[in-house]
Amino acid sequence: MADGTHSTHRNPSTAQLIELALSRGEGELTANGALVAKTGERTGRSPNDRFIVKEPGSEADIDWGTVNKPFEQTVFTALWNRVESYLGDKELFVSDLEVGADPEHYQPVRVTTETAWHQLFARNLFIVPEQFNAADKPIWQIMNAPGFECIPERDGTHSDATVIINFAERKVLLAGLKYAGEMKKSMFSVQNFLLPAKGVLPMHCSANVGIKGDTTLFFGLSGTGKTTLSADPKRFLIGDDEHGWAPGGVFNIEGGCYAKCIDLSQKNEPVIWNAIRFGTVLENVTMDENRVPDYTDSTLTENSRAAYPLEHIELRKEENLGAEPHAVVFLTCDVSGVLPPVSILTKEQAAYHFLSGYTAKVGSTEMGSSSAIQSTFSTCFGAPFFPRPAGVYAELLMKRIESFGSQVYLVNTGWTGGPHGIGKRFDIPTTRAIVDAIVNDDLKGVETEHLAKLNLNVPLAIPGVETKLLNPVNTWEDKAKYAEYAQQLAESFTENFAKYQVPDSIKNAGPNA
């Protein structure tokens, strides 16, 4: 990249980047030492602005549609050159990082940013290796220019901003976007395309490990509890959002955490609270007059975030790796108040619910989404990030579960006693007690009750959980109303699942509409 008049900061330290971000007016320092940055009107991902370059090497393997939208190679080249030229006379920040904490499955990536704070984010969220690219793999390039304004008529984009992935050239272009989450999710999408070809399942999940070396995975959309539940003071964290499951073990795709901050409290989330300090980027968080962050304030967005390196977490797996999981938890946030707090799934039910990805958008991470909580089906609990057809990932999950014998659970972190607005949301201590029972193997072989309409098996008792909560009908005053809502939910599952071509054993593992 041309750089005639200004310096380029290569592999800058955390302190250097914070110093530069402050001197350049990119952010402010909080009382707890974190750097606060604002992202303007885009406070979440922009799915309508995300594209994949259509080229012969990957075209046949991508599930083209509203999520994976095609972009012309020649138009991409022109835009990349235009952005490169725009950055040519600017002070730049460049780091050599890696994505994937596995010596075989990592991808080397050179990240170039226009701002110091985006570079700090990249160094917090990606892996800063002791030796860059030890296996001498071809290097990916990320070019991040938030100050560049796209012109759709000229650049072929949807708006004034864009995210474009080019598999053939190993390039990711981010232009006109300040929201830093786009950077991490673009490389997640890259790994989600590359890993299945090697027999590795990429997952939108968090992971932690117990003292005995037992790994647990938590799948779920943003706001359903992935980060909160994996940040367990009694267990060692592997990572909070993106992992690969290979034969023999699980590895983190990242080197940091990107935790939601809305209503963050020291009491309920001590691990995250303590991780927010010097070196952390707080995105769209407001402060009081004493520079103390106000995590209750959603003026800027419900999607306020903290980006910090894994080193900020005391109890963690330093090598970012774990054994294959003995327990897999699908986190669903049920706004209808129909699903039980926990169900024990068969292998076929696991495939059904993995493909369905039923949950809710909570404090949505996407631009243009209403702030209201709404139910959604998100394939693999992360539809926006998976370039291949859903069946590829479901098949890999089934293989991994079968070969290792992992037990899968469906845990509802949403509502009970009625839908959102009438019922109440399961509190964090209740969900934690359920997760404790799962990781301690207390639910293996327990007596269960079958909920026919939902086709789910629920335990009759769990230590530390009020028994009344376990069968959701018991928490509804109006039982007929519950039956009505359960029927509606079963129908929506069936309707959504009709698009999948899968064996009957999986098709019949869902609710009975």
UniProtKB/Swiss-Prot annotation:
One of its GO terms (cellular component) is cytosol. CDD domains: PEPCK_ATP. The keyword Manganese applies. The keyword Heme does not apply. Binds 1 Mn(2+) ion per subunit. SUPFAM superfamilies: PEP carboxykinase N-terminal domain, PEP carboxykinase-like. Keywords: ATP-binding, Cytoplasm, Decarboxylase, Gluconeogenesis, Lyase, Manganese, Metal-binding, Nucleotide-binding. Signal peptide: none annotated. Disulfide bonds: none annotated. Substrate binds at residues 45, 179, 185, 305. InterPro entries: PEP_carboxykinase_ATP (IPR001272), PEP_carboxykinase_C (IPR013035), PEP_carboxykinase_N (IPR008210), PEPCK_ATP_CS (IPR015994). Its EC number is 4.1.1.49. ATP binds at residues 185, 204, 220-228, 269, 305, 431. Belongs to the phosphoenolpyruvate carboxykinase (ATP) family. This is Phosphoenolpyruvate carboxykinase (ATP). It comes from Shewanella sediminis (strain HAW-EB3).
